Amino acid sequence: MERKTKDEKNLKKAKKLDSKTNRKYSSRGQMKRRIKNSKTISNVKEIGDDGLIYLKSGEVATLIEVKAIDLSLTSNHEKNLFFSMLKALYQVPNLNLKCYKLNEKLNLNANKDNLDKKIERFQNDEGKKILLEESRNLIDDLEEKNFTVSSKYFWVLIAKDTAVLNKQLDEIEDITLNIVPRIYIESVTNKLEIYKFLSNLYLTSNSLDELVWSDLPSLVSPMNMSERTDRIKFDDKEFQILTVKNVPPFVSELFFEDIFNYPDVRASIGIQECITQEELIRWVNSQYQFLLTDRNTTKKLSDATELDTQKENFQALMQDIKNGDEKIKEVSLILIVEGDKKHRDEVIRDLKRIADSYQIKLDVPRLRQMEAWQSYDISTKTFEDYCFYLPTLTLSAGFPFTKTYFNDSNGYMFGVDIHTSLPIFFDPFVLNNSRTSHNMAIISSTGGGKSYTMKKMIVNEYGRGTKIFIFDAENEYKKIVEANKGEYIDLYSKTGGIINPLQIRFIPSDDENHDTKETDCPLAKHLGFLEAFFKTAFESITEKELVMLLAIVEKLYNKKGIYKNTSINTLQNMKPEEFPIFSELYEFLPEYKKDVDSKEKEKIIEQLDILLSRFLTGTDSYLFDGHTNIDLSNDLIAFNLQELLYSGNQRLINTQTLNLLTYLNNSIVANKINNDKVKLEDRKHVMIIADEFHLFIDENNFEVLRNFGQLARRIRKYSGSLVVATQSVKDFVGSQSILRHSTAIFNNCQYQMIGMLKEDDLLAYLELFKQNPLTDTQKNFLMSARRGEFLLNIDSKNRLRIWIRATELEREMMGEGETR
């Protein structure tokens, strides 16, 4: 009752709106012609207020939208299980089902709106504005060239009356609910949506406003119609209808997929039960006799082997039919090919080539085009001579609703879906029930396109306002930083940047119920960082020395006016020069020593004097003994760590990496505090990128990996993302200790992008990601992937094969082309 009221209100609203506007509708003569043509073209009588479709032939039908399932990446076991469970749907008693694939442009309006808002937001930032405008224009260009036309799938269930219809619909809903992977269906009862479907089905050019306002299904029919020998013309649209003449009873899985989903071709599969059990057995016997004749006359061993397999299949089929486990269905496939003659000929030739590979015979029925159309229509009418019989298991194995589409409306075009050739718009900062963090792991063997992919991501994230920090292990990112006027900071030279380890860190909270606020007091957590830092800097420091050193550091902080109750808000207002440095700490030792009350403590302080003197000379001095002098205000900052990582000094590598990693927490926390003060759409994201991540492994000290693991856990709550990338995944499974710490990081990566992998790299990947295994199909893809081709794991149920593509402007901003 509520649905009826809602539809009535929508209809009245549309009529009221149209009465106030100057729209041109069909004249009375045009309407008469449409109504006359509809008697031949459409079997639809009316759309009921209950959302059902009432047919001229007396039956009633309901429209069901079906979400696609990409079976191309599932394992053989998963596919066979799916086909076996789907068989029950086709065995619903007295089933009359039409399966439709219609072409529909992807709705990218939300993508455009989001880009328009960003263009307005960055109106005064020329670099970002140019990239955003190109991204916006790219969508228009893709739409204009029909690169955004996707498949939309529907079932139309037809029954003799509403009681039978509702019973069958309940059965179908139960079956689809329990199939693995699940088929998501939705009954379409809204009149506007039903008219949209009919308009698409019948190739109409009438406006939806006119159809809804008139409430006449006959208006979806053309005004002028003519049938030729091998084609039909509706108004100014000429098209040809193809149908299947023959399908083998046992054929390769997904045999309908490529034919049914051919771009810009409408398709219909009709499924009905119209032969008795006795006729079934007679039909199987006749097919079996034909097979035996072929087997007795063949002389080729390969043919004989294939025929023997078919013979066994027929025997099993006969037994299943007798046991009631299998049924045979009458099936028809209709294809509508539009365009000029040259285009139609090319499409038909290509469709026949695809069909031949499955031993399926496609035909253009001559002098029977209108009869073929009526079989395509919503009806139970069979197309004599062009129907074929299939066991329900074979029919299930031909499941055609497989072309999925992925779109994050707030994302950027990341690449092209290899399976569907559609653009993929990706936003790593989506947050929902199945996407619970923003972290990503990018893994491929050498030459797989890992760095190119990361640069593509960096440019687009920077363009939409994300603050990006890059751990540059190979001096690969200097060009991209310079091309976008970022900051490139050397952290291993006398003239490079200094990060003072004694400047207070704002360590994010691990508590899910507590977000860091500007009123929090960070000194206690900062001392925890210094404990790890000192253990790494002084490999031989004892527990007593460490406890004493931390007590001295805290006393020095107190002398500077920093206490355990000093808030982040206060610390943010302090200048770097107001924090102590190691020379001051060293000079403070004698003062602290005066107040100790035991000889043992005096000896410990004397030992600390020796340890801390390390920070006063040599490399430690110019890396750590000084006030922080780097500026993190730029949105694109790369830290050059190449010389550090290849220095061979693992102690310095670990201490400086820890120093940098924890210092970035200040930016992460400050960004969170600022985000809490602004509107949702104005919030800023932070992305930390660590390329060549395997170079940060130290088998004797896991403090760096442990801190990366903590960051991976915490950063989600702070609008942040950690991206780790490697071309040497084997290094992460070198020992159980390394594997344990590495798994803590990689298991916190929502997204995995896996590119071309050599066999040993693939084995290492499978070991590292045991909780998220790959199917044989996915493994084969990775073993044969080309440069730039990746398997993108969105969540446990959503995996895409993506080909990374970049525009000329993007390549320029990536430092891969000439500067503007």
Predicted regions and their residues:
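The Walker A (P-loop) glycine that initiates the GxxxxGKT/S ATP-binding motif of P-loop NTPases
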Residues: 443-444
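Conserved H-loop
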Residues: 473, 691, 717-720, 725-734, ...
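Extended, folded cores of ATP/NTP-driven motor/assembly subunits in large transport
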Residues: 2-399
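Conserved lysine of the Walker
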Residues: 450
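Hydrophobic positions on the alpha1 helix immediately C-terminal to the Walker A/P-loop
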Residues: 453
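P-loop NTPase motor core of the ASCE superfamily
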Residues: 142-146, 173-174, 181, 440, ...
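P-loop NTPase motor domains
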Residues: 51-54, 64-69, 76-94, 100-105, ...
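Walker A (P-loop) phosphate-binding loop of P-loop NTPases
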Residues: 447
